[in-house]
Amino acid sequence: MKRFGKYRAVKSQCRAGHTHDSKREAIRCNELHDLQAAGAISDLIIHPQYWFVINGRQIKHSNGRRVGYKSDFEYVEKGINVTEDVKGVVVRDWPLRRAIFIALFPHHQLRETK
């Protein structure tokens, strides 16, 4: 019997062999690899991680864990750094995490793909 995640997403692999949290994310990874091969985008990174730091101090949870954001993809498109997240279900903490990311990383364009 297949085991589903919290939102019934099935872990899937893209053609490049990366494991993704959902089929939709794996399909988007294939599209981005095709765009990179065609020269439309460059410097594709899978699952980049960003840590939230304000005034040189790491933001931490009450238990001491660092607060950050792990997106699905990062790439350069027409000279612009794009951070992309494939969204199925919008989770409770996403609006806050999104706002913090935009404030701390203004040189990145954050895109949500449905």
Report the location of each language-model feature.
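Electrostatic, structured charged patches in enzyme active sites and in nucleic-acid/phosphate-binding
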Residues: 1-114
